[in-house]
Curated annotation (Swiss-Prot):
Domain text: The cysteine framework is III (CC-C-C-CC).
Similarity annotation: Belongs to the conotoxin M superfamily.
Compartments, as annotated in UniProt: Secreted
Disulfide pairings: C2-C12, C3-C10, C8-C13
Gene Ontology cellular-component annotations: extracellular region
Lineage of source species: Eukaryota, Metazoa, Spiralia, Lophotrochozoa, Mollusca
A Gene Ontology molecular function term of the record: toxin activity
Alphabetized UniProt keyword annotations: Disulfide bond, Hydroxylation, Secreted, Toxin
Protein name: Conotoxin Reg12d
Length: 15
């Protein structure tokens, strides 16, 4: 999952 990466640009991380 991209949310697990150091730099996250996914909607699930941004809110």
């Amino acid at each position: 999952k991209c949310c697990m990466r150091p730099i996250c640009t996914c909607p699930c991380c941004i809110g």
